[in-house]
Protein backbone atom coordinates (compact mmCIF):
# COMPACT_ATOMS: atom_id res chain seq x y z
CA UNK A 1 0.00 0.00 0.00
CA UNK A 2 2.85 2.37 0.73
CA UNK A 3 4.39 1.57 -2.64
CA UNK A 4 1.15 2.45 -4.45
CA UNK A 5 0.84 5.74 -2.63
CA UNK A 6 4.25 6.92 -3.75
CA UNK A 7 4.11 5.60 -7.39
CA UNK A 8 1.98 8.45 -8.90
CA UNK A 9 4.78 10.92 -8.19
CA UNK A 10 7.04 9.13 -10.62
CA UNK A 11 6.69 10.04 -14.38
CA UNK A 12 4.87 7.34 -16.41
CA UNK A 13 3.38 5.67 -13.38
CA UNK A 14 -0.01 7.38 -13.82
CA UNK A 15 -0.56 5.96 -17.29
CA UNK A 16 0.31 2.46 -16.11
CA UNK A 17 -2.10 2.74 -13.20
CA UNK A 18 -4.88 3.99 -15.49
CA UNK A 19 -4.31 1.15 -17.90
CA UNK A 20 -4.46 -1.32 -15.08
CA UNK A 21 -7.71 0.09 -13.72
CA UNK A 22 -9.56 0.49 -17.06
CA UNK A 23 -8.03 -2.24 -19.15
CA UNK A 24 -9.31 -5.76 -19.45
CA UNK A 25 -7.77 -8.58 -17.42
CA UNK A 26 -5.63 -9.61 -20.38
CA UNK A 27 -3.69 -6.35 -20.20
CA UNK A 28 -2.72 -6.88 -16.53
CA UNK A 29 0.54 -8.57 -17.48
CA UNK A 30 1.64 -5.49 -19.41
CA UNK A 31 0.82 -3.24 -16.46
CA UNK A 32 2.89 -5.33 -14.09
CA UNK A 33 5.84 -5.10 -16.44
CA UNK A 34 5.45 -1.34 -16.66
CA UNK A 35 5.43 -1.01 -12.86
CA UNK A 36 8.59 -3.06 -12.56
CA UNK A 37 10.31 -0.84 -15.11
CA UNK A 38 9.27 2.25 -13.17
CA UNK A 39 10.64 0.84 -9.94
CA UNK A 40 13.92 0.08 -11.62
CA UNK A 41 14.21 3.68 -12.72
CA UNK A 42 13.87 5.05 -9.10
CA UNK A 43 16.95 6.46 -7.29
CA UNK A 44 18.84 4.19 -4.86
CA UNK A 45 18.15 6.41 -1.81
CA UNK A 46 14.40 6.26 -2.33
CA UNK A 47 14.48 2.48 -2.74
CA UNK A 48 16.54 2.14 0.45
CA UNK A 49 14.05 4.30 2.32
CA UNK A 50 11.17 2.17 1.19
CA UNK A 51 12.81 -1.11 2.22
CA UNK A 52 14.30 0.15 5.59
CA UNK A 53 12.65 -1.10 8.82
CA UNK A 54 11.82 0.94 11.94
CA UNK A 55 14.88 2.70 13.51
CA UNK A 56 14.24 1.13 16.97
CA UNK A 57 14.90 -2.36 15.63
CA UNK A 58 18.07 -1.31 13.83
CA UNK A 59 19.78 0.45 16.81
CA UNK A 60 21.51 -2.74 17.98
CA UNK A 61 22.92 -3.27 14.51
CA UNK A 62 25.11 -0.14 14.65
CA UNK A 63 28.80 -0.57 14.13
CA UNK A 64 29.85 0.86 17.51
CA UNK A 65 27.43 0.07 20.42
CA UNK A 66 26.77 2.71 23.12
CA UNK A 67 29.43 2.68 25.88
CA UNK A 68 29.00 4.37 29.33
CA UNK A 69 30.53 7.82 29.49
CA UNK A 70 31.91 9.74 32.47
CA UNK A 71 29.23 12.06 33.84
CA UNK A 72 31.72 14.44 35.46
CA UNK A 73 33.57 14.90 32.22
CA UNK A 74 30.25 15.40 30.36
CA UNK A 75 29.34 18.15 32.85
CA UNK A 76 32.53 19.97 31.86
CA UNK A 77 32.15 19.44 28.08
CA UNK A 78 34.45 16.45 27.62
CA UNK A 79 33.37 13.01 26.37
CA UNK A 80 35.37 10.14 27.82
CA UNK A 81 34.60 6.46 28.20
CA UNK A 82 34.00 5.34 31.76
CA UNK A 83 35.95 2.08 31.55
CA UNK A 84 39.23 2.51 33.42
CA UNK A 85 38.61 6.23 33.70
CA UNK A 86 37.17 6.68 37.19
CA UNK A 87 40.52 6.76 38.95
CA UNK A 88 42.13 9.13 36.44
CA UNK A 89 39.23 11.53 35.89
CA UNK A 90 40.27 15.18 35.94
CA UNK A 91 37.12 16.21 37.81
CA UNK A 92 36.86 13.32 40.29
CA UNK A 93 37.24 15.76 43.23
CA UNK A 94 35.13 18.54 41.77
CA UNK A 95 32.63 20.13 44.15
CA UNK A 96 30.48 22.05 41.75
CA UNK A 97 26.70 21.79 41.89
CA UNK A 98 26.38 19.27 39.06
CA UNK A 99 29.17 17.01 40.33
CA UNK A 100 27.76 17.13 43.89
CA UNK A 101 24.36 16.09 42.58
CA UNK A 102 25.98 13.20 40.71
CA UNK A 103 27.80 12.04 43.85
CA UNK A 104 24.54 12.15 45.87
CA UNK A 105 22.74 10.10 43.23
CA UNK A 106 25.53 7.55 43.24
CA UNK A 107 25.33 7.23 47.03
CA UNK A 108 21.55 6.72 47.00
CA UNK A 109 21.78 4.12 44.25
CA UNK A 110 24.51 2.23 46.12
CA UNK A 111 22.38 2.18 49.28
CA UNK A 112 19.37 0.88 47.36
CA UNK A 113 21.40 -1.87 45.75
CA UNK A 114 22.84 -2.95 49.12
CA UNK A 115 19.36 -3.00 50.69
CA UNK A 116 17.93 -5.09 47.87
CA UNK A 117 20.78 -7.55 48.16
CA UNK A 118 20.25 -7.87 51.92
CA UNK A 119 16.51 -8.38 51.49
CA UNK A 120 17.06 -11.00 48.85
CA UNK A 121 19.53 -12.82 51.09
CA UNK A 122 17.13 -12.75 54.06
CA UNK A 123 14.28 -14.04 51.93
CA UNK A 124 16.41 -16.90 50.71
CA UNK A 125 17.44 -17.80 54.27
CA UNK A 126 13.84 -17.55 55.45
CA UNK A 127 12.71 -19.81 52.65
CA UNK A 128 15.37 -22.35 53.58
CA UNK A 129 14.45 -22.16 57.28
CA UNK A 130 10.78 -22.58 56.44
CA UNK A 131 11.64 -25.74 54.60
CA UNK A 132 13.69 -26.96 57.58
CA UNK A 133 11.54 -25.86 60.55
CA UNK A 134 8.09 -25.48 59.08
CA UNK A 135 5.78 -22.49 59.43
CA UNK A 136 6.28 -19.06 61.00
CA UNK A 137 6.99 -20.62 64.40
CA UNK A 138 10.28 -21.91 63.03
CA UNK A 139 11.08 -18.44 61.72
CA UNK A 140 10.34 -16.89 65.10
CA UNK A 141 12.55 -19.49 66.79
CA UNK A 142 15.36 -18.75 64.37
CA UNK A 143 14.96 -15.00 64.93
CA UNK A 144 15.05 -15.50 68.70
CA UNK A 145 18.21 -17.60 68.44
CA UNK A 146 19.96 -14.96 66.35
CA UNK A 147 20.10 -16.99 63.14
CA UNK A 148 18.30 -14.26 61.23
CA UNK A 149 17.74 -10.65 62.29
CA UNK A 150 14.27 -9.92 63.70
CA UNK A 151 11.80 -8.51 61.21
CA UNK A 152 8.17 -7.47 61.73
CA UNK A 153 6.92 -10.69 60.11
CA UNK A 154 8.82 -12.82 62.62
CA UNK A 155 8.19 -10.93 65.86
CA UNK A 156 5.45 -13.12 67.29
CA UNK A 157 6.63 -12.33 70.83
CA UNK A 158 6.54 -8.58 70.36
CA UNK A 159 3.00 -8.17 71.68
CA UNK A 160 3.82 -10.30 74.72
CA UNK A 161 6.86 -8.15 75.54
CA UNK A 162 4.82 -4.98 75.09
CA UNK A 163 2.04 -6.29 77.31
CA UNK A 164 4.43 -7.38 80.07
CA UNK A 165 6.73 -4.39 79.98
CA UNK A 166 4.18 -1.66 79.30
CA UNK A 167 2.26 -1.90 82.58
CA UNK A 168 1.29 1.27 84.39
CA UNK A 169 4.38 2.62 86.10
CA UNK A 170 6.26 -0.66 85.63
CA UNK A 171 9.61 0.87 84.79
CA UNK A 172 9.70 3.92 87.01
CA UNK A 173 11.53 3.40 90.29
CA UNK A 174 9.73 4.77 93.32
CA UNK A 175 11.89 7.66 94.40
CA UNK A 176 12.39 9.31 91.03
CA UNK A 177 10.36 12.17 89.71
CA UNK A 178 8.13 12.17 86.66
CA UNK A 179 10.93 13.26 84.33
CA UNK A 180 13.13 10.25 84.98
CA UNK A 181 10.32 7.69 84.71
CA UNK A 182 10.88 7.03 80.99
CA UNK A 183 14.61 6.39 81.35
CA UNK A 184 14.12 4.13 84.35
CA UNK A 185 11.40 2.21 82.53
CA UNK A 186 13.56 1.63 79.45
CA UNK A 187 16.49 0.46 81.59
CA UNK A 188 14.30 -1.99 83.51
CA UNK A 189 12.80 -3.38 80.33
CA UNK A 190 16.17 -3.77 78.66
CA UNK A 191 17.34 -5.71 81.72
CA UNK A 192 14.34 -8.01 81.53
CA UNK A 193 13.87 -8.63 77.80
CA UNK A 194 16.79 -8.71 75.38
CA UNK A 195 15.38 -10.73 72.47
CA UNK A 196 13.63 -7.87 70.70
CA UNK A 197 15.34 -4.63 71.78
CA UNK A 198 13.53 -2.27 69.43
CA UNK A 199 10.13 -3.05 70.90
CA UNK A 200 11.37 -2.31 74.42
CA UNK A 201 12.43 1.32 73.98
CA UNK A 202 8.95 2.64 74.68
CA UNK A 203 8.18 3.77 78.20
CA UNK A 204 5.06 3.01 80.21
CA UNK A 205 1.58 4.01 79.09
CA UNK A 206 1.08 7.77 78.96
CA UNK A 207 -2.03 7.75 81.10
CA UNK A 208 -0.65 5.65 83.92
CA UNK A 209 -0.34 7.26 87.37
CA UNK A 210 3.14 7.42 88.81
CA UNK A 211 3.84 6.48 92.43
CA UNK A 212 4.41 9.48 94.70
CA UNK A 213 7.90 10.36 95.91
CA UNK A 214 9.21 8.45 98.89
CA UNK A 215 8.86 10.09 102.28
CA UNK A 216 11.80 9.87 104.68
CA UNK A 217 11.61 7.11 107.26
CA UNK A 218 12.39 9.40 110.20
CA UNK A 219 11.59 13.06 110.82
CA UNK A 220 15.21 14.15 110.48
CA UNK A 221 15.40 12.54 107.02
CA UNK A 222 19.01 11.40 107.38
CA UNK A 223 18.51 7.71 106.73
CA UNK A 224 18.43 7.34 102.96
CA UNK A 225 19.64 9.25 99.94
CA UNK A 226 18.01 9.74 96.55
CA UNK A 227 20.35 7.34 94.78
CA UNK A 228 19.53 4.19 96.71
CA UNK A 229 16.46 3.16 94.74
CA UNK A 230 16.50 -0.11 92.86
CA UNK A 231 14.79 -0.12 89.45
CA UNK A 232 14.40 -3.90 89.32
CA UNK A 233 10.73 -4.81 89.17
CA UNK A 234 8.61 -7.77 88.31
CA UNK A 235 6.14 -7.91 85.48
CA UNK A 236 2.72 -6.92 86.69
CA UNK A 237 3.93 -5.01 89.74
CA UNK A 238 3.90 -1.26 90.19
CA UNK A 239 0.77 0.77 90.68
CA UNK A 240 -1.42 -2.31 90.16
CA UNK A 241 -0.55 -3.58 93.64
CA UNK A 242 -0.94 -0.23 95.38
CA UNK A 243 -0.51 2.90 93.30
CA UNK A 244 -1.71 5.39 95.86
CA UNK A 245 0.30 4.19 98.83
CA UNK A 246 3.72 5.57 99.60
CA UNK A 247 6.57 3.79 101.26
CA UNK A 248 5.82 5.37 104.60
CA UNK A 249 2.73 3.18 104.98
CA UNK A 250 4.50 -0.12 104.30
CA UNK A 251 5.50 -2.59 107.06
CA UNK A 252 9.20 -1.82 106.56
CA UNK A 253 8.65 1.84 107.30
CA UNK A 254 6.66 1.01 110.42
CA UNK A 255 9.34 -1.41 111.58
CA UNK A 256 12.03 1.21 111.00
CA UNK A 257 10.05 3.79 112.95
CA UNK A 258 9.56 1.40 115.84
CA UNK A 259 13.23 0.46 115.77
CA UNK A 260 14.09 4.15 115.91
CA UNK A 261 11.90 4.55 118.99
CA UNK A 262 12.48 1.29 120.91
CA UNK A 263 16.13 0.35 120.32
CA UNK A 264 18.54 2.06 122.70
CA UNK A 265 21.10 2.99 120.05
CA UNK A 266 18.61 4.79 117.84
CA UNK A 267 17.14 7.32 120.26
CA UNK A 268 17.67 10.84 119.03
CA UNK A 269 15.82 14.12 118.46
CA UNK A 270 12.37 13.26 117.24
CA UNK A 271 13.06 9.53 117.37
CA UNK A 272 10.27 8.69 119.83
CA UNK A 273 7.58 11.16 118.78
CA UNK A 274 5.78 8.93 116.31
CA UNK A 275 3.05 6.54 117.29
CA UNK A 276 1.91 3.52 115.33
CA UNK A 277 -1.71 3.41 114.28
CA UNK A 278 -3.39 0.06 115.07
CA UNK A 279 -5.25 0.05 111.76
CA UNK A 280 -2.15 0.29 109.60
CA UNK A 281 -1.01 -3.27 110.18
CA UNK A 282 -1.48 -5.31 107.01
CA UNK A 283 -1.82 -9.11 106.79
CA UNK A 284 1.07 -11.31 105.77
CA UNK A 285 -0.03 -12.14 102.24
CA UNK A 286 -1.07 -8.62 101.12
CA UNK A 287 1.63 -6.21 102.15
CA UNK A 288 0.97 -2.65 101.11
CA UNK A 289 3.10 -0.83 98.59
CA UNK A 290 4.66 -2.05 95.38
CA UNK A 291 7.68 -4.24 94.86
CA UNK A 292 9.77 -1.24 93.90
CA UNK A 293 8.94 0.38 97.24
CA UNK A 294 9.98 -2.78 99.07
CA UNK A 295 13.25 -3.03 97.20
CA UNK A 296 13.98 0.61 97.99
CA UNK A 297 13.20 0.00 101.64
CA UNK A 298 15.66 -2.87 101.65
CA UNK A 299 18.32 -0.78 99.97
CA UNK A 300 17.89 2.16 102.38
CA UNK A 301 19.70 1.60 105.70
CA UNK A 302 17.55 1.49 108.80
CA UNK A 303 18.09 4.41 111.20
CA UNK A 304 18.70 2.11 114.17
CA UNK A 305 21.31 -0.02 112.43
CA UNK A 306 23.56 2.74 111.08
CA UNK A 307 24.25 1.07 107.71
CA UNK A 308 26.12 2.53 104.77
CA UNK A 309 24.70 4.21 101.70
CA UNK A 310 24.85 1.22 99.34
CA UNK A 311 22.63 -1.87 99.24
CA UNK A 312 23.18 -4.28 102.12
CA UNK A 313 22.31 -7.85 102.92
CA UNK A 314 19.23 -8.58 104.99
CA UNK A 315 19.86 -9.12 108.65
CA UNK A 316 17.90 -11.77 110.60
CA UNK A 317 15.89 -9.00 112.22
CA UNK A 318 14.90 -7.65 108.81
CA UNK A 319 13.78 -11.12 107.75
CA UNK A 320 11.61 -11.44 110.85
CA UNK A 321 10.20 -7.97 110.23
CA UNK A 322 9.19 -8.90 106.71
CA UNK A 323 7.75 -12.27 107.70
CA UNK A 324 5.74 -10.81 110.61
CA UNK A 325 4.84 -7.23 109.64
CA UNK A 326 2.17 -6.99 112.31
CA UNK A 327 4.59 -7.41 115.23
CA UNK A 328 6.85 -4.78 116.67
CA UNK A 329 10.50 -4.74 115.86
CA UNK A 330 11.59 -4.71 119.49
CA UNK A 331 9.53 -7.82 120.25
CA UNK A 332 10.98 -9.68 117.28
CA UNK A 333 14.45 -8.61 118.36
CA UNK A 334 13.88 -10.12 121.80
CA UNK A 335 12.66 -13.38 120.27
CA UNK A 336 15.71 -13.47 118.00
CA UNK A 337 18.08 -12.85 120.91
CA UNK A 338 16.43 -15.60 122.92
CA UNK A 339 16.88 -18.04 120.03
CA UNK A 340 20.58 -17.22 119.79
CA UNK A 341 20.23 -15.47 116.43
CA UNK A 342 18.57 -18.46 114.75
CA UNK A 343 15.93 -17.09 112.38
CA UNK A 344 14.26 -20.45 111.77
CA UNK A 345 13.81 -21.16 115.47
CA UNK A 346 12.45 -17.67 116.08
CA UNK A 347 9.90 -18.07 113.28
CA UNK A 348 8.85 -21.43 114.71
CA UNK A 349 8.35 -19.89 118.14
CA UNK A 350 6.12 -17.12 116.81
CA UNK A 351 4.15 -19.54 114.62
CA UNK A 352 3.65 -21.96 117.52
CA UNK A 353 2.31 -19.13 119.62
CA UNK A 354 -0.04 -18.02 116.85
CA UNK A 355 -1.28 -21.57 116.34
CA UNK A 356 -1.93 -21.94 120.06
CA UNK A 357 -3.73 -18.61 120.26
CA UNK A 358 -6.01 -19.43 117.30
CA UNK A 359 -6.84 -22.87 118.70
CA UNK A 360 -7.65 -21.35 122.09
CA UNK A 361 -10.02 -18.83 120.49
CA UNK A 362 -8.17 -15.86 121.96
CA UNK A 363 -6.47 -14.56 118.81
CA UNK A 364 -5.12 -11.05 118.48
CA UNK A 365 -8.04 -10.08 116.23
CA UNK A 366 -10.48 -9.76 119.18
CA UNK A 367 -11.03 -6.02 119.73
CA UNK A 368 -10.84 -4.84 123.35
CA UNK A 369 -13.59 -2.78 124.88
CA UNK A 370 -13.27 0.81 126.08
CA UNK A 371 -12.57 -0.14 129.68
CA UNK A 372 -9.76 -2.41 128.54
CA UNK A 373 -8.28 0.41 126.47
CA UNK A 374 -8.33 2.73 129.48
CA UNK A 375 -6.66 0.07 131.61
CA UNK A 376 -4.03 -0.37 128.91
CA UNK A 377 -3.26 3.35 129.00
CA UNK A 378 -2.84 3.18 132.76
CA UNK A 379 -0.55 0.18 132.37
CA UNK A 380 1.52 2.12 129.83
CA UNK A 381 1.98 4.97 132.28
CA UNK A 382 3.09 2.61 135.06
CA UNK A 383 5.41 0.52 132.91
CA UNK A 384 8.80 2.21 133.71
CA UNK A 385 8.23 1.74 137.44
CA UNK A 386 7.45 -1.94 136.92
CA UNK A 387 10.61 -2.40 134.88
CA UNK A 388 12.66 -0.68 137.60
CA UNK A 389 11.08 -2.93 140.22
CA UNK A 390 11.82 -6.02 138.13
CA UNK A 391 15.44 -4.93 137.71
CA UNK A 392 15.77 -4.34 141.45
CA UNK A 393 14.28 -7.76 142.20
CA UNK A 394 16.65 -9.40 139.73
CA UNK A 395 19.64 -7.66 141.31
CA UNK A 396 18.52 -8.73 144.78
CA UNK A 397 18.14 -12.35 143.63
CA UNK A 398 21.70 -12.36 142.28
CA UNK A 399 20.66 -13.14 138.69
CA UNK A 400 21.71 -11.31 135.57
CA UNK A 401 20.29 -7.90 134.92
CA UNK A 402 17.80 -6.82 132.35
CA UNK A 403 18.81 -7.03 128.69
CA UNK A 404 19.73 -3.81 126.98
CA UNK A 405 16.42 -3.30 125.12
CA UNK A 406 14.47 -3.61 128.40
CA UNK A 407 16.46 -1.22 130.60
CA UNK A 408 14.37 1.76 131.54
CA UNK A 409 15.89 5.10 130.61
CA UNK A 410 15.23 8.31 128.70
CA UNK A 411 16.12 6.69 125.37
CA UNK A 412 13.09 4.37 125.33
CA UNK A 413 9.69 6.14 125.30
CA UNK A 414 6.77 4.33 126.97
CA UNK A 415 4.75 3.74 123.82
CA UNK A 416 7.61 2.00 122.00
CA UNK A 417 8.46 -0.50 124.73
CA UNK A 418 8.44 -4.25 123.95
CA UNK A 419 5.41 -6.05 125.30
CA UNK A 420 6.48 -8.53 127.97
CA UNK A 421 3.77 -10.13 130.03
CA UNK A 422 6.20 -10.85 132.86
CA UNK A 423 7.91 -7.45 132.96
CA UNK A 424 6.54 -6.54 136.37
CA UNK A 425 7.34 -6.89 140.04
CA UNK A 426 6.97 -10.42 141.44
CA UNK A 427 4.43 -9.18 143.99
CA UNK A 428 2.14 -7.92 141.24
CA UNK A 429 1.57 -11.41 139.81
CA UNK A 430 -1.84 -12.81 140.59
CA UNK A 431 -3.06 -16.37 140.67
CA UNK A 432 -3.39 -17.46 137.03
CA UNK A 433 -5.52 -20.53 136.44
CA UNK A 434 -5.19 -21.22 132.68
CA UNK A 435 -3.69 -24.73 132.53
CA UNK A 436 -4.71 -26.17 129.16
CA UNK A 437 -2.33 -27.60 126.59
CA UNK A 438 -2.30 -24.29 124.72
CA UNK A 439 -1.73 -21.98 127.67
CA UNK A 440 1.58 -20.07 127.80
CA UNK A 441 4.24 -20.63 130.42
CA UNK A 442 3.12 -19.04 133.65
CA UNK A 443 5.80 -17.27 135.73
CA UNK A 444 3.80 -17.70 138.92
CA UNK A 445 4.88 -19.50 142.08
CA UNK A 446 1.37 -20.33 143.26
CA UNK A 447 0.52 -21.89 139.89
CA UNK A 448 3.21 -24.52 140.24
CA UNK A 449 2.35 -25.21 143.86
CA UNK A 450 5.80 -24.34 145.21
CA UNK A 451 7.02 -21.81 147.71
CA UNK A 452 8.82 -18.81 146.26
CA UNK A 453 11.80 -19.16 148.63
CA UNK A 454 12.05 -22.94 148.65
CA UNK A 455 14.93 -23.32 146.22
CA UNK A 456 17.60 -20.71 145.60
CA UNK A 457 18.05 -21.72 141.93
CA UNK A 458 14.51 -21.08 140.83
CA UNK A 459 13.37 -18.77 143.61
CA UNK A 460 12.04 -15.94 141.44
CA UNK A 461 10.12 -18.36 139.23
CA UNK A 462 9.01 -20.86 141.87
CA UNK A 463 10.42 -23.79 139.87
CA UNK A 464 12.04 -26.67 141.69
CA UNK A 465 15.30 -28.01 140.18
CA UNK A 466 13.69 -31.40 139.62
CA UNK A 467 10.74 -30.03 137.74
CA UNK A 468 12.90 -27.58 135.79
CA UNK A 469 15.17 -30.40 134.63
CA UNK A 470 12.19 -32.59 133.78
CA UNK A 471 10.47 -29.88 131.80
CA UNK A 472 13.65 -28.95 129.93
CA UNK A 473 14.33 -32.59 129.03
CA UNK A 474 10.75 -33.27 127.96
CA UNK A 475 9.94 -30.08 126.09
CA UNK A 476 13.26 -29.06 124.56
CA UNK A 477 11.89 -29.47 121.07
CA UNK A 478 9.06 -27.09 121.82
CA UNK A 479 11.31 -24.23 122.88
CA UNK A 480 11.41 -24.47 126.69
CA UNK A 481 15.17 -24.01 126.54
CA UNK A 482 14.29 -20.43 125.59
CA UNK A 483 14.10 -19.79 129.36
CA UNK A 484 17.88 -20.01 129.81
CA UNK A 485 18.89 -16.37 129.20
CA UNK A 486 15.78 -15.05 130.99
CA UNK A 487 15.89 -16.97 134.31
CA UNK A 488 15.07 -13.85 136.33
CA UNK A 489 11.82 -12.50 137.71
CA UNK A 490 9.37 -11.33 135.09
CA UNK A 491 11.54 -12.10 132.04
CA UNK A 492 10.20 -15.45 130.85
CA UNK A 493 8.54 -14.99 127.43
CA UNK A 494 5.04 -16.41 127.35
CA UNK A 495 5.31 -18.38 124.14
CA UNK A 496 2.82 -21.04 123.20
CA UNK A 497 4.26 -24.13 124.91
CA UNK A 498 2.87 -25.91 127.92
CA UNK A 499 3.96 -25.25 131.50
CA UNK A 500 5.88 -27.98 133.35
CA UNK A 501 2.91 -28.92 135.56
CA UNK A 502 0.79 -29.69 132.46
CA UNK A 503 2.97 -32.66 131.57
CA UNK A 504 1.11 -34.79 134.13
CA UNK A 505 -1.17 -37.37 132.55
CA UNK A 506 -4.19 -36.05 134.39
CA UNK A 507 -3.89 -32.71 132.58
CA UNK A 508 -3.31 -33.98 129.05
CA UNK A 509 -7.01 -34.20 128.21
CA UNK A 510 -7.99 -30.84 129.61
CA UNK A 511 -9.55 -28.25 127.35
CA UNK A 512 -10.27 -24.56 127.71
CA UNK A 513 -12.98 -25.11 130.32
CA UNK A 514 -10.71 -23.85 133.08
CA UNK A 515 -9.97 -20.72 131.05
CA UNK A 516 -13.69 -20.16 130.44
CA UNK A 517 -14.46 -20.54 134.14
CA UNK A 518 -11.66 -18.13 134.98
CA UNK A 519 -13.06 -15.60 132.50
CA UNK A 520 -16.49 -15.88 134.16
CA UNK A 521 -14.99 -15.25 137.62
CA UNK A 522 -12.95 -12.27 136.32
CA UNK A 523 -9.66 -13.97 136.98
CA UNK A 524 -6.69 -12.51 135.05
CA UNK A 525 -5.67 -14.80 132.19
CA UNK A 526 -3.13 -14.68 129.42
CA UNK A 527 -4.53 -14.04 125.95
CA UNK A 528 -3.32 -14.73 122.46
CA UNK A 529 -0.82 -11.91 121.92
CA UNK A 530 2.83 -12.68 121.41
CA UNK A 531 3.80 -11.83 125.00
CA UNK A 532 0.32 -11.89 126.50
CA UNK A 533 -2.19 -9.03 126.34
CA UNK A 534 -3.15 -9.33 130.04
CA UNK A 535 -0.91 -7.72 132.65
CA UNK A 536 -2.38 -7.09 136.13
CA UNK A 537 -5.86 -7.55 134.73
CA UNK A 538 -5.31 -4.89 132.03
CA UNK A 539 -4.89 -5.84 128.36
CA UNK A 540 -1.85 -4.34 126.75
CA UNK A 541 -1.69 -2.89 123.27
CA UNK A 542 -0.27 -5.11 120.53
From Swiss-Prot:
Q: Please name the Pfam families in this protein's record.
A: DM, DMA, DMRT5_DMB
Concerning SMART domains, the annotation shows: DM
Q: Which UniProt keywords apply?
A: DNA-binding, Metal-binding, Nucleus, Zinc
Which tissues is this chain's protein expressed in? Answer: Expressed in testis.
Write out the GO biological process terms.
cerebral cortex regionalization; dopaminergic neuron differentiation; neuroblast proliferation; neuron fate specification; positive regulation of neuroblast proliferation; regulation of transcription by RNA polymerase II; sex differentiation; skeletal muscle cell differentiation
Ranges where the DMA domain occurs: 314-349
List the GO cellular component terms. chromatin; nucleus
Question: Annotated DNA-binding ranges?
Answer: 70-117
Q: Where is this region: Disordered?
A: 201-316
Molecular-function annotations in GO: DNA-binding transcription factor activity, RNA polymerase II-specific; identical protein binding; metal ion binding; RNA polymerase II cis-regulatory region sequence-specific DNA binding; sequence-specific double-stranded DNA binding
Record's InterPro entries?
A: DM_DNA-bd, DM_DNA-bd_sf, DMA, DMRT, DMRT5_1_DMB_dom, UBA-like_sf
The record's function comment reads: May be involved in sexual development.
Q: What is this protein called?
A: Doublesex- and mab-3-related transcription factor A2
Amino acid sequence: MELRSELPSVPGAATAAAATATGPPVASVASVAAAAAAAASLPVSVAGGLLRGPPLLLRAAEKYPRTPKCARCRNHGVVSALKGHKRYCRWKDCLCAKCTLIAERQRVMAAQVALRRQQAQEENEARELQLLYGTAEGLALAAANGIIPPRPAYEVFGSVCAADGGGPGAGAPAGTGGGAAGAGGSEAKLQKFDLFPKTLLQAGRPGSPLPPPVKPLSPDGADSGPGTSSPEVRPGSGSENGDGESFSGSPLARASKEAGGSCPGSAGPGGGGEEDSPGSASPLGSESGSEADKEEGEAAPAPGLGGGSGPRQRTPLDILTRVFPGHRRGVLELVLQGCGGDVVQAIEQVLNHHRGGLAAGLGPAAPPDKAAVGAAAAADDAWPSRVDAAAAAAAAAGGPGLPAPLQAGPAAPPHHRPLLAGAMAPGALGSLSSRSAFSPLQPNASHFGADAGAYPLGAPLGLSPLRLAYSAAAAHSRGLAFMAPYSTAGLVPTLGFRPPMDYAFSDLMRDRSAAAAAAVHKEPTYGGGLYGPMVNGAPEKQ
